[in-house]
């Protein structure tokens, strides 16, 4: 079953005017209610206003400077209504329930209003006077705005309730599409997003109230409606006035059942919000707000930082008198000279009296390392063994004798140099025989004593001198030393010369100097060869 609307009613401008007035009153219903309650609020006391402001949530700023007015409404095509279901038997005769499908196309709507562009003015008007600054120029700046909705297409499934003199409607499934245009292009995208998000409230509250108010004009006429409307307004005003009258939540007898500690904390919080003071309500705590540090408790925080100076606060003699009056101690970093020392340092008095403890120092250092690293790495300490007895000189000499090999020095025959009478004899060669006669050997054997064979156990022990490690030379000193060694190496000595065995014990040819045939320049060449490879150059030497 379906119905058709009368086309003459939509062709006439009266229907559009009725829709325009109904939409204007519905959109301005909230602003009118707030303006009516404003004079009632001024009569209340200041205490009740503060309690209400504290109990309410955060207040939203209203940027509307004036009311919302619907300037144009146009329905070029007749809306269509299709009844999907109708229930009459189960209900009384005065109630009609049905499910309908409503469709509307090519509708147009234009809305005008004014907004406040100076948001700082809104914040200062709503905020308390003792927290708002005094601005030199804080005037109002009103901007008019016009919003136009074109090509509105609506398809919805609705539940309709008809009872005596009114029609109630609720929207279930809604498909809405429109073209939006705003006079301020900068705000068009943001307003369009907000409108699409607020369409749910439009179809739940605005349109049902508009249809309900228009249905009362369709079904009934006369003074009864005016009287009922006036009665409703008077009843509404009485309810509003009653809602703003102060009410007693707790009586004096009820205060005895409350905890005194809780009441003290509540009163402290209320006073802190009014005076912006941060007096702590708990004892032995750094701050009442977790994660925040108050200025008055900064000395407690500094005293709990792991440092050697915090373990010996009594050894600092200087304290400021103005802090002593409040029962506080000055920071441990301040000394008598007025300069700042390191945070991790012992006082001089502790070092003089030797009143420190190694375990305490180790624990402090480990805590500092754990706080600084934060990655859970193990602490690596340097271990020093104290009280270990050193070996005596006799024990060292015995160890050297046991480790060094034994050497037997054979007795060399005494060689007497032949006397040279004249210089001619020195330069004139004398013939000698390679093989001597047996008689000469016999004579020489009597004069020369052959040493007896000595076993290792019977031989006298000769200890070799301990070789000391030569000092480390740098590149320039090593090159100079090798050049000097080469000059001594060129000497032709005898095979059995003791000079070669003792002073020049060379088994292989010396290495060539490092700096030979290399074009390198060093700063040390002009400074007497006094710095090595591990030291800094002379300009940077400390």
From Swiss-Prot:
Q: Where is the composition biased (Basic and acidic residues)?
A: 49-58
User: Which GO terms of type biological process are on file?
Assistant: mitochondrial genome maintenance; mitochondrion-endoplasmic reticulum membrane tethering; phospholipid transport
Gene Ontology molecular function, alphabetical: lipid binding
Where are the stretches annotated Disordered? Answer: 27-58, 372-435
GO CC, sorted alphabetically, is: ERMES complex
The topology of this chain with respect to the membrane is: Multi-pass membrane protein
Bias class Low complexity marks the residues at: 31-48, 403-414
From start to end residue, where is composition biased (Basic residues)?
379-394
Which superkingdom, per the lineage? Answer: Eukaryota
What's the stated role of this polypeptide? Component of the ERMES/MDM complex, which serves as a molecular tether to connect the endoplasmic reticulum (ER) and mitochondria. Components of this complex are involved in the control of mitochondrial shape and protein biogenesis, and function in nonvesicular lipid trafficking between the ER and mitochondria. MDM34 is required for the interaction of the ER-resident membrane protein MMM1 and the outer mitochondrial membrane-resident beta-barrel protein MDM10.
The record's note on its domains:
Lacks alpha-helical transmembrane segments, suggesting that it resides in the membrane via beta-sheet conformations similar to those predicted for other outer membrane proteins and porin.
Q: How does it assemble?
A: Component of the ER-mitochondria encounter structure (ERMES) or MDM complex, composed of MMM1, MDM10, MDM12 and MDM34.
What protein is this chain from?
Answer: Mitochondrial distribution and morphology protein 34
Q: Native species of this protein? A: Lachancea thermotolerans (strain ATCC 56472 / CBS 6340 / NRRL Y-8284)
